[in-house]
Design a protein with these regions (language model features):
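Hydrophobic anchor at the beta1->P-loop junction of P-loop NTPases
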Residues: 34
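Conserved lysine of the Walker
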Residues: 42
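Conserved catalytic network of the ASCE P-loop NTPase/AAA+ motor domain
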Residues: 114-121, 141-150, 195-198
Length: 231
C-alpha cells in the first residue's frame, strides 16, 4: 500500500463550533503548562489546582509527565509489557529520554493539551519540558490552532535545584550524581543535562518560599483577572 502523502491529508471541520462546546461547559478552555525541575512541585501544584477548579464547577484535567509515559508516550519496555506490542513496533514508537525523544514527548502532549483546551477543558500539563524550543513549539501549536488561537499559560515552577535534591522523592538526583561520579552520564535534567528556564512565563512559583495554597491562589487569581474563572 502506497504511503499517504501530506498533500492528501486535509483538516475536516465539524459542525459544532468551539463557542458551542465552551458554552456547554460554561467556560473557555485553556492550557496551563507547568514546567520545572524534577521534584520542584509541578504535579503537586497542578493536582491541587485541579481540585480547586473542580470544586468551583470548572472542568479540568491534569496531564502528568509520569502518567503519560505509562501510555501515550511510553517507552519500549512498557509498550511490550502492558500493550503487547511486538519488539520492533515498541522500539519504533516508544519514547526514551534522549533529546530527540524528549522533543517528541513534548510535541505529542502539546497536541493533546491543545485538543483538551479546544474542547473547553482546562488542561493542566505537568512536564519537566527542559528545552525552551520545545515549550515554544507547544505554545505555537496552541496559537496556530485551526479553529483559532487557544490560551497557553506557562507556569514556571522555579524551585531551586538544592530544594529539589533535598526532596528527591524518586531518588533520581542521587542516582544521577552517582552515575556522573562514576563517569557514566544519565542525561538527567539539572545534573548532566540542562534545564532552560522560561524567559517570560506568565507566572512563576517557588515551592521553597511559597506554600501550595499560595501557588494555587496565584494561578487562580490570574485566571479570575483574565476572565477564565469567575471570582
Amino acid at each position: 500500500m502506497a504511503d499517504i502523502q501530506p498533500t492528501q491529508v486535509f483538516y475536516h471541520a465539524g459542525t459544532v463550533t468551539r463557542d458551542e462546546r465552551h458554552a456547554l461547559l460554561k467556560q473557555n478552555g485553556a492550557t496551563l503548562w507547568f514546567t520545572g525541575l524534577s521534584g520542584s512541585g509541578k504535579s503537586t501544584l497542578a493536582v491541587a489546582l485541579e481540585q480547586v477548579l473542580i470544586q468551583r464547577g470548572h472542568a479540568a484535567y491534569v496531564l502528568d509527565g509520569d502518567n503519560v509515559r505509562m501510555g501515550l508516550n511510553a517507552g519500549p519496555k512498557i509498550l511490550m509489557d502492558t500493550r503487547a506490542l511486538a519488539e520492533t513496533s515498541a522500539k519504533r514508537f516508544g519514547l526514551g529520554f534522549s533529546p530527540e525523544d524528549r522533543e517528541e514527548n513534548i510535541r505529542r502532549i502539546g497536541e493533546v493539551s491543545r485538543l483538551f483546551a479546544d474542547s473547553g477543558l482546562f488542561a493542566l500539563t505537568s512536564f519537566i519540558s527542559p528545552y525552551r524550543k520545545d515549550r515554544d513549539a507547544a505554545r505555537k501549536i496552541h496559537e496556530q490552532n485551526k479553529t483559532g488561537a487557544i490560551p497557553y499559560i506557562e507556569i514556571f515552577v522555579n524551585t531551586p535545584i538544592e530544594t529539589c535534591e533535598q526532596r528527591d522523592p524518586k531518588g533520581l538526583y542521587k542516582q544521577a550524581r552517582d552515575a556522573v561520579a562514576a563517569g557514566k552520564g544519565m542525561g538527567f535534567t539539572g545534573v548532566d543535562d540542562p534545564y532552560e528556564a522560561p524567559l517570560k512565563p506568565e507566572l512563576s512559583w517557588d515551592a521553597s518560599t511559597q506554600t501550595v495554597e499560595q501557588g494555587v491562589a496565584l494561578v487562580l487569581n490570574y485566571l479570575i483577572e483574565r476572565g477564565y474563572v469567575k471570582s
